[in-house]
Every structure is written in structure tokens, then in C-alpha cells.
């Protein structure tokens, strides 16, 4: 989504 939450290589 907006890049608000990132985990390892995944931003949502």
C-alpha cells in the first residue's frame, strides 16, 4: 500500500 509498514523486503 502506502509503504507505512515494512518487514524484511515487504512494504505495505
Swiss-Prot record:
- Which domain of life does the protein's organism represent? Eukaryota
Protein's job: Urotensin is found in the teleost caudal neurosecretory system. It has a suggested role in osmoregulation and as a corticotropin-releasing factor.
Listed transmembrane segments: none
Q: Which UniProt keywords apply?
A: Disulfide bond, Hormone, Secreted
Disulfide pairings: 6-11
GO terms for MF: hormone activity
Keyword Cytoplasm in record? no
Q: Which family does it belong to?
A: Belongs to the urotensin-2 family.
Give a GO cellular-component term: extracellular region
Keyword check for Disulfide bond: yes
| Coiled-coil intervals, chain numbering | none
Its subcellular locations are: Secreted
Q: What is this protein called?
A: Urotensin-2A
**Example GO biological process:** blood vessel diameter maintenance
Amino acid at each position: 500500500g502506502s509503504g507505512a509498514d515494512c518487514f524484511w523486503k515487504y512494504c505495505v
